[in-house]
């Protein structure tokens, strides 16, 4: 079920403040470190880089216009799929 339109997109307040500060700092601001995977990417985030925590390490996410409306966590995968085990019978 989608979020109701009248509520607007969810963004953690501390993340919004950090993004505004980074916009004011300009190009000299580094990536914004965040644990808030649940925050929606809004147009003010375009051009910024976030380090999003995936449960083990921080994954750099550079925000582009196509990402607006998605969640930050969508771009920092939490699971690693190493592939299926090789077929032992076929190796003979």
Swiss-Prot record:
Family to which the UniProt record says this protein belongs: Belongs to the universal ribosomal protein uS19 family.
The organism of origin for this protein: Novosphingobium aromaticivorans (strain ATCC 700278 / DSM 12444 / CCUG 56034 / CIP 105152 / NBRC 16084 / F199)
UniProt name for this protein: Small ribosomal subunit protein uS19
Recorded GO MF terms: rRNA binding; structural constituent of ribosome
Keyword vocabulary terms for this entry: Ribonucleoprotein, Ribosomal protein, RNA-binding, rRNA-binding
Domain of life (superkingdom): Bacteria
GO CC list: cytoplasm; small ribosomal subunit
PROSITE patterns in the cross-refs: RIBOSOMAL_S19
């Amino acid at each position: 079920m989608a979020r109701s339109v009248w509520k607007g997109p969810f963004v953690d307040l501390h993340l919004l403040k950090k993004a505004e500060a980074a916009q004011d700092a300009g190009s000299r601001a580094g990536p914004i470190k965040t644990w808030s995977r649940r925050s929606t990417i809004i147009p003010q985030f375009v051009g910024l880089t976030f380090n999003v925590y995936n449960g083990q390490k921080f994954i750099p996410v550079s925000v582009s216009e196509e990402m607006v409306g998605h969640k930050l966590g969508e771009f920092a995968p939490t699971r690693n799929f190493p592939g299926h085990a090789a077929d032992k019978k076929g190796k003979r």
